[in-house]
Amino acid sequence: MPKHSKRYLEARKLVDRTKYYDLDEAIELVKKTATAKFDETIELHIQTGIDYRKPEQHIRGTIVLPHGTGKEVKVLVFAKGEKAKEALEAGADYVGAEDLVEKIEKEGFLDFDVAIATPDMMRIIGRLGKILGPRGLMPSPKSGTVTQEVAEAVKEFKKGRIEVRTDKTGNIHIPVGKRSFDNEKLKENIIAAIKQIMQMKPAGVKGQFIKKVVLASTMGPGIKLNLQSLLKE
């Protein structure tokens, strides 16, 4: 069993572990239990009813949070010529082609949160799969990161579009803001995230798709949400 800090144990006392909280109350509580000295990220942990053994039930896509995550997103773009210029003008942090592939391969450069590529770049970045894939950074048409519309993609990811995927236990983890966000912004982000995840339900999923939703800060305890009231929001 991991040993928890005194701060965490004190925060856990504030949470009734048998209770399923309404969203407004959960947001108040998650802020109270976020007592670290930095501006903690507020995260949504969603347990789904997918069968992870079936690849067609894996979820991977993007959602848009109306107020972003509160984190400055570094965007890298693999593109050449006019598309490279468009990406830079849209605010991309790094733009290049073979030079960036080499930097990632030889120098282990990974100082970015999202990688976008034009379709013609896939032949040269394919070999980065082993490096970028496990980190969730490999451009993919499914997640909207392989596109000709690089300027639009850069702007959207900078504004608050984030990639989501199920992990090996069928759970989805989504940053929905910071402790410093006001309650209404957190609420709007959470509701937007849940609604968009509901739309990603794979056709083959039997029974309940979203089984449990937990709200937590980076260093704080989990707060279970009342699913019935949440899905009515």
UniProtKB/Swiss-Prot annotation:
PROSITE patterns: RIBOSOMAL_L1 (PS01199). GO terms for biological process: regulation of translation; translation. One of its GO terms (cellular component) is large ribosomal subunit. Keywords: Repressor, Ribonucleoprotein, Ribosomal protein, RNA-binding, rRNA-binding, Translation regulation, tRNA-binding. NCBIfam families: rplA_bact. Part of the 50S ribosomal subunit. Belongs to the universal ribosomal protein uL1 family. HAMAP family: Ribosomal_uL1_B. Binds directly to 23S rRNA. The L1 stalk is quite mobile in the ribosome, and is involved in E site tRNA release. Protein L1 is also a translational repressor protein, it controls the translation of the L11 operon by binding to its mRNA. This is Large ribosomal subunit protein uL1. The gene is rplA.
